[in-house]
Amino acid sequence: MNEVVQSPAIQPLPKSAPTAGKQNLLDLDRAGLEKFFVEVLGEKKFRAHQVMKWIHHRYVTDFDEMTDLGKVLRAKLQAHAEVLVPNIVFDKPSADGTHKWLLAMGVDGKNAIETVYIPDKTRGTLCVSSQVGCGLNCTFCSTATQGFNRNLTTAEIIGQVWVAARHLGNVPHQMRRLTNVVMMGMGEPLMNFDNVVRAMSVMRDDLGYGLANKRVTLSTSGLVPQIDRLSAESDVSLAVSLHAPNDALRETLVPLNKKYPIAELMASCARYLRANKRRESVTFEYTLMKGINDKPEHARELARLMRQFDNAVQAKDSGKVNLIPFNPFPGTRYERSEEAHIRAFQKILLDSNVLTMVRRTRGDDIDAACGQLKGQVMDRTRRQAEFNKTLQAGKGSDAAA
């Protein structure tokens, strides 16, 4: 998977502004597209399936190029619909094969997000963003330094997959270079619940990108009610940004812990696994920072927490730990743990029979490593005001408050 097929540089599509009265088909999953074709276009459902394959399998956005559609249907589509994908500001390869795209969201140039493709020997993983910025203020994350602006639409989320898959020459079921998607980019996915779940549906649909449920992973900082809702409405792998083994420390790193402490978070994760026997484990992400959370006593405390989690689920290896060496960014006060401390931390966990791996740092030469994403954004004060407005408005079940 390390070899990425070189394709011609992808130019931004000439049209990026939505047209009033037209439906962006990237905003729709299979059910939504079928409904649009039946109720708006007066067509059969199978026509929606044809168009979905043109968009997500062949990366065609011009209805006139969808050659197995009749002229009448193409005319209807031209009148009522469009396919708008994110504009590419730049794409940047890393020496290790990692690739980062900066994608413009909207037409004002003020909102941009980053998407990262990470190739490995047996798989290719795309790290996808769910928000422009983030308002959770995790103190060790670069994205948090920019504050929050807005949620991404379904089209803007799945559009990241479209851009990357097109660049890679990915053909579902034939030439698969994109094997996994992780919702671990900019933003808290569960604060944009509906759009994220709809986008993940397209990722897992055979008419979309055909990924198995377990190959789509949602990472959350720990919004307990939304984890329970996710369990009922979707079926993907769950990862939790833990980063500390106790509430006192986690509250300094992940302020959301004050609202949803570790005991509540772990209980919701146990419910998530128990609700579906096909769900085998939850991954707990733990970023190691020098002198902060990398001491032997932290490792022993984390091991106890994982044993308690196994007992709650009543299954061995229900919790897996992913140790992440901290990736520095300008202005941070944190430092990466020394390699010897990382290995010693891992050994304590392994000796306690906790499945543990250390994530290799990839893409740090292009600021694409874990915790380094932040895009081109507005000033923090304005963005935080937008986040507070979102919380106050409630935004249904998509808000954290």
Curated annotation (Swiss-Prot):
GO CC terms: cytoplasm
Annotated Radical SAM core domain residues: 120-365
EC number of this enzyme: 2.1.1.192
Keywords, sorted A to Z: 4Fe-4S, Cytoplasm, Disulfide bond, Iron, Iron-sulfur, Metal-binding, Methyltransferase, rRNA processing, S-adenosyl-L-methionine, Transferase, tRNA processing
Reactions the enzyme catalyzes: adenosine(2503) in 23S rRNA + 2 reduced [2Fe-2S]-[ferredoxin] + 2 S-adenosyl-L-methionine = 2-methyladenosine(2503) in 23S rRNA + 5'-deoxyadenosine + L-methionine + 2 oxidized [2Fe-2S]-[ferredoxin] + S-adenosyl-L-homocysteine; adenosine(37) in tRNA + 2 reduced [2Fe-2S]-[ferredoxin] + 2 S-adenosyl-L-methionine = 2-methyladenosine(37) in tRNA + 5'-deoxyadenosine + L-methionine + 2 oxidized [2Fe-2S]-[ferredoxin] + S-adenosyl-L-homocysteine
CDD domains: Radical_SAM (cd01335)
Cofactor note: Binds 1 [4Fe-4S] cluster. The cluster is coordinated with 3 cysteines and an exchangeable S-adenosyl-L-methionine.
Cofactor(s) needed by this chain: [4Fe-4S] cluster
Active-site residues, as the UniProt record annotates them: 114 (proton acceptor), 370 (s-methylcysteine intermediate)
Family: Belongs to the radical SAM superfamily. RlmN family.
Function: Specifically methylates position 2 of adenine 2503 in 23S rRNA and position 2 of adenine 37 in tRNAs. m2A2503 modification seems to play a crucial role in the proofreading step occurring at the peptidyl transferase center and thus would serve to optimize ribosomal fidelity.
Protein name (Swiss-Prot/TrEMBL): Dual-specificity RNA methyltransferase RlmN
Species annotation: Stenotrophomonas maltophilia (strain K279a)
Record lineage: Bacteria, Pseudomonadati, Pseudomonadota, Gammaproteobacteria, Lysobacterales
Gene: rlmN
